[in-house]
């Protein structure tokens, strides 16, 4: 059973986090290219423009907000594995404890490594959306009611 938990951490948790990072990166690149090439003058309505510019940004935000939790799940499983080994053997084997804790910390670190750049990417793209909306307002003579 403990071997399955170790494999779940190594392949399940780490694989999920790597998949999440690739999804965030792919969506981020696609959104950046789309936002950059969007011609604001082609939109009669600001709402239509905003809808077009913000497509799929929620995916990046979801990855950014959930990656730490996936990493935390790996941490909990790694610590569970460590305690199980200690309890089952009745003696403290430093090597096995360190391997279990290293596995736990690896999951936490990878969760943060995925979350932090995803958050930065999301905020960058939201800023680009705001710039395009301001360009639309300038062209159409509308003033934004909120100033940031």
From Swiss-Prot:
Cellular component terms per the entry's GO annotation: plasma membrane
Domain of life: Bacteria
Membrane topology: Multi-pass membrane protein
Cell compartments where the protein resides: Cell membrane
Main localization, broad class: membrane
Transmembrane segments: 9-29, 67-87, 97-117
GO biological process: protein import; transmembrane transport
Tagged with keyword Protein transport: yes
Alphabetical keyword list: Cell membrane, Membrane, Protein transport, Transmembrane, Transmembrane helix, Transport
Similarity comment: Belongs to the ExbB/TolQ family.
NCBIfam families (alphabetical): exbB2 (TIGR02805)
UniProt-listed PANTHER family: BIOPOLYMER TRANSPORT PROTEIN EXBB (PTHR30625:SF15), PROTEIN TOLQ (PTHR30625)
Chain's role: Involved in the TonB-dependent energy-dependent transport of various receptor-bound substrates. Protects ExbD from proteolytic degradation and functionally stabilizes TonB.
Subunit structure, interactors included: The accessory proteins ExbB and ExbD seem to form a complex with TonB.
Record protein name field: Biopolymer transport protein ExbB
Organism name: Aquifex aeolicus (strain VF5)
Classification of source organism: Bacteria, Pseudomonadati, Aquificota, Aquificia, Aquificales
């Amino acid at each position: 059973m403990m071997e399955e938990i170790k494999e779940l951490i190594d392949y399940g948790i780490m694989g999920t986090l790597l998949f999440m990072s690739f999804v965030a990166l792919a969506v981020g690149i696609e959104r950046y290219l789309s936002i950059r090439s969007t011609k604001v003058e082609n939109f009669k309505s600001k709402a239509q423009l905003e809808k077009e510019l913000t497509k799929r940004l929620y995916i990046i935000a979801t990855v950014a907000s959930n990656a730490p939790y996936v990493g935390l799940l790996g941490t909990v499983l790694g610590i569970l594995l460590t305690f199980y080994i200690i309890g089952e053997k009745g003696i403290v084997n430093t090597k096995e404890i360190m391997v279990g804790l290293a596995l736990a910390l690896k999951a936490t670190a990878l969760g943060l490594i995925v979350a932090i750049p995803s958050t930065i990417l999301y905020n960058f793209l939201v800023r680009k959306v705001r710039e395009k909306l301001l360009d639309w307002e300038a062209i159409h003579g509308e003033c934004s009611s909120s100033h940031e």
